[in-house]
Amino acid sequence: MYEQAIVIRNDLKMGKGKMAAQACHASIQAFLHAQKISSSAVSGWMNEGQKKVVLKVNSEKELLEIFKNVNIEGLPCSLIRDAGRTQIEPGSLTAVGIGPEKEEKISKVTKDLKLL
């Protein structure tokens, strides 16, 4: 089975709409990266219904650690930096998108995270 994981910073106290927008940015950017490096995973994910899991971290440090580990594993990913036009400071790191890729590959990095 394939999935995509989106990891959101919970400490920024973004509103629900802002959080949803950041998750969408992370999802789309990771998907575009996956198209370039893992087209078979993208095809499998599309055929299986495009499962997404949204998880949380509580600091920028935790978010960067996830992003580092995702890159070490060679998974398609994205790191989202907010423009700062609305609720949070410009340049704030808000989310990481991972995949689509096989669930077991993503869970190597995300297994200890809680659902948002």
From Swiss-Prot:
UniProt enzyme class: hydrolase
Tagged with keyword Cytoplasm: yes
UniProt xrefs under SUPFAM superfamilies: Peptidyl-tRNA hydrolase II
The enzyme's E.C. designation: 3.1.1.29
InterPro entries per record: Pep_tRNA_hydro_II_dom_sf, Pept_tRNA_hydro_arch, PTH2
GO terms (BP aspect): translation
GO terms for cellular component: cytosol
Keywords, alphabetical: Cytoplasm, Hydrolase
Keyword Transport: no
GO molecular function: peptidyl-tRNA hydrolase activity
Catalytic activity: an N-acyl-L-alpha-aminoacyl-tRNA + H2O = an N-acyl-L-amino acid + a tRNA + H(+)
Location(s) in or outside the cell: Cytoplasm
Record-annotated disulphide pairs: none
Entries under Pfam families matching the protein: PTH2 (PF01981)
HAMAP family in the cross-refs: Pept_tRNA_hydro_arch
Record-stated family: Belongs to the PTH2 family.
Listed PANTHER family: PEPTIDYL-TRNA HYDROLASE 2, PEPTIDYL-TRNA HYDROLASE 2, MITOCHONDRIAL
Role played: The natural substrate for this enzyme may be peptidyl-tRNAs which drop off the ribosome during protein synthesis.
Name listed for the protein in its UniProt record: Peptidyl-tRNA hydrolase
